[in-house]
A protein has these predicted regions:
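Acidic/histidine-rich catalytic cores of soluble enzymes
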Residues: 1-20, 24-27, 37-46
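Aromatic-rich peripheral "rim/lid" segments of glycoside hydrolase catalytic domains that contact
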Residues: 25-45, 51-156
Length: 156
């Protein structure tokens, strides 16, 4: 980005695609990326935000949408609902991310989620079709998950 700006190109913002998991990306590195982009004098746009709660096949990596794996129960363990411990872990991850966004609210122009409710998350069909994921802030009945209230309180 510095090279482009040095050539006189106007750059107003940069998007950080944020398909996250319960344990990735490393939050310190994620926050450093926000700082690094903001240091270039642009607004940071958090894009495609979701959190994958499901295990991925060994050898899986990146975002190659052509990459598909066979459905196996071990990669789809929460068809009857998210267990309380996983829900707690997911809520903590949402809050950890939104605490970073709040801390850097002067540097971040917007946060865009990659969908509205769990029913329609792309992660139900990729990288394994037919899975049940809980990747968004609204459940399958379009009801806000409890963590939404915590996020709202954070920004008040």
């Amino acid at each position: 980005m510095k090279n482009l700006k040095a050539k006189g190109l106007r750059i107003d913002g940069v998007g950080m695609q944020s398909h996250n998991g319960l344990d990735y990306p490393n939050l310190d590195e994620y926050e450093k990326s926000i700082d690094a982009f903001a240091a270039c004098g642009v607004k940071v746009l958090i894009t495609e935000l979701d959190i994958n709660v499901l295990p991925n096949p060994q050898g899986f990596g990146g975002a190659d949408i052509a990459q598909n794996f066979e459905l196996q129960q071990k990669y789809n363990p929460y068809t009857a609902g998210l267990p309380a411990d996983k829900e707690k872990e997911l809520n903590k991850r949402w809050m950890d991310l939104f605490k970073i966004y709040y801390k850097h609210r002067d540097q971040i122009g917007r946060v865009t989620l990659w969908g509205v409710c769990d029913e329609n998350s792309w992660l139900n069909g990729w990288p394994i079709k037919g899975r049940t994921n809980y990747a968004l802030l609204f459940d399958r009945q379009y009801q806000a998950k409890p963590v939404v209230n915590d996020i709202i309180k954070l920004f008040k």
